[in-house]
């Protein structure tokens, strides 16, 4: 079993080293970048920890998870967020939730038609299922802060919109916490009609503005 664990780690770290290689402009030779080296070392350590912390039956699985998380940590902040972004894109495929990158931050835009009915702060089943996928990734990559912001369109009173947007942000946060995400990582805020991403003069624009954004930032 130990040989299998080390083989898994070696394969992961080797793949990372190859993918992280660059060409030295002075020698013309391929070299491993610092992030790739760090990721490879991290994968070896992570695989060992993952295997040791798992039961005999699950050691192979534990090694794989530990190797991935260790590689992300070893490769630095940028690599850590790169891997997390890729996993989120995979989980969010076909859900209607967009994943964008801004520097080292990852932003999930959850439109209202996915998450909530009109004037409601109760998550739809589709929204709850989507957040299950988000939570799975967040638990695998715990070194990120989670900022949940609720938005509305400009229809209705300002106080009502502020309250509703806060309630929706809180509902999303509660769902993540219920799925096992550490509550200490999460902050919520309701901004009502602020920061529109489309015009509030059309029904289509209003629909885009009714959303919850989850911003992930490195700790």
Swiss-Prot record:
Instruction: Please verify whether the record's keywords include Iron-sulfur.
Output: no
Q: Where in the cell is it found?
A: Cell inner membrane; Cell outer membrane
List the transmembrane segments: 37-55, 62-84
Q: Which residues form the signal peptide?
A: 1-20
Alphabetical list of CDD domains matching this protein: OmpA_C-like
Stretches assigned to the OmpA-like domain: 103-219
Lipid attachment site numbers (N-palmitoyl cysteine) = 21
Query: GO biological process: any one?
Result: bacterial-type flagellum-dependent cell motility
Q: Tell me, according to the record, the phenotype of the null mutant.
A: No visible phenotype.
User: Which Gene3D superfamilies does this one have?
Assistant: OmpA-like domain
Impact after mutating residue 168 to A: Does not suppress BamB ts-mutants
Residue positions of covalent lipid attachment, annotated as S-diacylglycerol cysteine: 21
Topology relative to the membrane, per the entry? Multi-pass membrane protein; Lipid-anchor
The answer to whether UniProt assigns keyword 4Fe-4S to this entry is no
**Protein function:** Suppresses temperature-sensitive mutations in BamB when overexpressed.
UniProt-recorded name of the protein: Probable lipoprotein YiaD
Q: Which organism is it from?
A: Escherichia coli (strain K12)
The taxonomic lineage of its organism, from the top, reads:
Bacteria, Pseudomonadati, Pseudomonadota, Gammaproteobacteria, Enterobacterales
Q: Which gene encodes it?
A: yiaD
